[in-house]
Swiss-Prot record:
Natural source organism: Shewanella oneidensis (strain ATCC 700550 / JCM 31522 / CIP 106686 / LMG 19005 / NCIMB 14063 / MR-1)
Keyword Cytoplasm found: yes
Family assignment from sequence similarity: Belongs to the SurE nucleotidase family.
EC number in record: 3.1.3.5
Protein name: 5'-nucleotidase SurE
GN (gene name): surE
C-alpha cells in the first residue's frame, strides 16, 4: 500500500490536516507530522540553533516544535518507517496563490519533500469562512490517485488551491500559472498593554495580475487551480542579458 507523509503549517490540531489525513487514509498508509503551533508564513525556514522536540499524540499524529520544513525533513530522515511515496501538505486555511507561495509554510513543506526526492503536493482552501475542507480533501485524494496512476515529471511541486465551495459547485480543475499581488499594505503601529510600541505586518495586497490563466482567475471562477512549481529559482531568460551586462562593467 502506498505511504504518504502529511504535514502543514497551520499546526497539528488544525481542521485542514485532519480532513486531509482522513481522506488520504482511504487510499494509503498515512503518517502525519506537523508543527505543534501555527507556523503560517514560515516559508522554507529550518531550525538550526535549537533541538527539535516531538510529541506523539493519541490520534497517531506527531507534533514537532519546529517549522513545516523541519517536520518534513525530520519525518523523512528519521521518523518514517521507510520512505514515503509522496509528501502532501495542507489543507491550508487560506489561499497560497501568486506571491503567497514565497512565504507559505504549506508550499515549503511540499518543497522540502520534493527537495528530498519525493513527489509533492501542497493544497490550500481559498476563502474566509473555511466551511468546505471536505471539498479540498476530495480533490486532494483525486489528484494523489491521479499521480499514482499517471506519474508526472519529478522536478515539480503541484500547488493546488480550492474554492471554499460545496463539492457540487466546483466547475472543474484548471492548470494555471502564478498570478501576482500588489505590495502588502502598510505596517500597523500600536502599543501593548504596558504602553510599549509594537508593530503588526499589514495584510497582503490585492490581486495585481488575476488575468485568465492565473490561479487567481481560476479560483474566482469556481475552478480548482493546479500550478506546477519548481525548486530551481534561476531566471534562465535573463542569463544572456546578465552576461552582456557583466561584460560591460
Amino acid at each position: 500500500m502506498m505511504r504518504i507523509l502529511v504535514s502543514n503549517d497551520d499546526g497539528v490540531n488544525a481542521p485542514g490536516i485532519k480532513a486531509l489525513t482522513e481522506a488520504l487514509a482511504e487510499i494509503a498508509t498515512v503518517m502525519t507530522v506537523a508543527p505543534d503551533r501555527n507556523c503560517s508564513g514560515a516559508s522554507n525556514s529550518l531550525t538550526l540553533t535549537n533541538p527539535l522536540r516531538i510529541n506523539r499524540l493519541d490520534n497517531g499524529y506527531i507534533s514537532v516544535h519546529g517549522t513545516p520544513t523541519d517536520c518534513v525533513h525530520l519525518a523523512i530522515r528519521e521518523l518514517c518507517d521507510g520512505e514515503p511515496d509522496m509528501v502532501v501538505s495542507g489543507i491550508n486555511a487560506g489561499a497560497n496563490m501568486g506571491d503567497d507561495t514565497l512565504y507559505s509554510g504549506t508550499v515549503a513543506a511540499a518543497m522540502e519533500g520534493r527537495f528530498l526526492g519525493f513527489p509533492a503536493v501542497a493544497i490550500s482552501l481559498n476563502g474566509k469562512a473555511f466551511k468546505h475542507y471536505h471539498t479540498a480533501a476530495v480533490y486532494a485524494r483525486r489528484i494523489v490517485q491521479g499521480l499514482l496512476a499517471h506519474p508526472i515529471a519529478s522536478d515539480q511541486i503541484l500547488n493546488i488551491n480550492v474554492p471554499d465551495l460545496p463539492l457540487d459547485e466546483i466547475k472543474g480543475i484548471s492548470v494555471t500559472r502564478l498570478g501576482a499581488r500588489h505590495k502588502a499594505e502598510g505596517i500597523v503601529r500600536t502599543q501593548d498593554p504596558a504602553g510599549r510600541e509594537i508593530f503588526w505586518l499589514g495584510p497582503p495586497g490585492l490581486e495585481q495580475d488575476a488575468s485568465e490563466g492565473t490561479d487567481f482567475h481560476a479560483i474566482a471562477h469556481g475552478y480548482v487551480s493546479i500550478t506546477p512549481l519548481t525548486v530551481d529559482l534561476t531566471a534562465y531568460r535573463q542569463l544572456s542579458i546578465l552576461q552582456n551586462w557583466v561584460d560591460k562593467i
